Amino acid sequence: YFGIMDKLSIKRMDEEVFDRIYYKDAIYDYAMGHERFMETLCHSFPHERENLKRYVAAIRSVGNLISTDHLKKGRLSQEGMNFFATSAAGMIASVTTNRDLQNVLAATSLLYGGIKNKSTFYEHAMINNSYLESAYRFTEGSMQVSLELIHIIRANGGTVLNRKEVTRILVKDETIQGVEVNHEEILESTYVISNLHPQLTLSLLDKNHSIKPAFVSRIKSLENSYGIFTLNLMMKKDCCPYQNHNIYLHGNEDVWYDKEMHKGNTPSCMISMQVPRGNSKFTEVVSILTPMYMDEVSKWTDTTPEHRGEAYRQFKEEKTEQILQLLRRFGFHWNHYIEKIHTTTPLSYRDYTGTIDGSAYGIVKNYQYPQILSLIHI
């Protein structure tokens, strides 16, 4: 962890329940640890023990592929690529025919931008196995990771530049020369590592013969994942009891988000609470996330933050009320706890992170086309 792990302020989530699923008038808990996870779900699905064993074994096998030794190689093993060519929903269905259990096992698909007819079992298993091994929350916000990384970079002779937008990646004789910053300053370098969306990275590159136009067109044509509508509730002091687990609410029988079917609606959401300060037992901030595609805010595509107009504000208020209605449906009557509300849409993600379409997870990883992953080196 670059020597920062012992400097981070984190809190271990409840081992008995780190994720709580509300589905079809019932509550299901994800417990930490592979055996505990299986035993906990067996209380709700007593006849599914053997199938749950098979499921746990499957996600564990993927988890073994993302060890440090594997990741240092820079590429997925052939076994890993096989899981990329396997449907998440299909794999779950092959493990159990119980529809309720299928949906409970897929209930946290928001964590990887899950799409029922596209998402890979690799994504599903990698995320779920990681949480089963250990689940934590930051107690002082995630910004501390950035600050500690900055300290490490500087301690090793590096420089971190703020307010510096890379506006061009310089190429000469098929070799990287450096980057242009803010359309004026040139920083020379032998290597450029970009964590931008591949489409953005390619748009910054000088013309060259190494990357073919057909490849660029292919990358531009790839579908991006949905974005996120985020509702941040600032709670009144000592009003909202802290819960040391995430909460997933699902109002439909099928927990997978569907672009066409759910457009304009809020069938599901994830709820996460900020760890209280000091010895308080009450949270001050509740964050609620629900999927949203850029299509829903496309009429404001050409606007900038704080200048989107009254119609945009009204749109966000209506979405907020949809979410609060979903919460009330499951017994979370928090309206009288709320002091202030802040919201973000895929437009916010686009403008502050530069990601295409305000996507939360970048290019969709489609199990039907695993070869695409080798092209973009994911």
Task: Give the positions of each predicted feature.
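Rossmann-like flavin
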Residues: 24-118
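Helical element adjacent to the flavin cofactor pocket in flavoenzyme catalytic cores
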Residues: 126-176
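A glycine-rich dinucleotide-binding beta-alpha-beta segment and adjacent secondary-structure elements
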Residues: 100-112, 332-376
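Mid-domain catalytic core of redox enzymes
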Residues: 137, 167-281
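Active-site-adjacent "gating/activation" loops or surface patches in catalytic cores
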Residues: 104-136, 375
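C-terminal segments that line or cap access tunnels to active or ligand-binding sites in enzymes
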Residues: 236-347
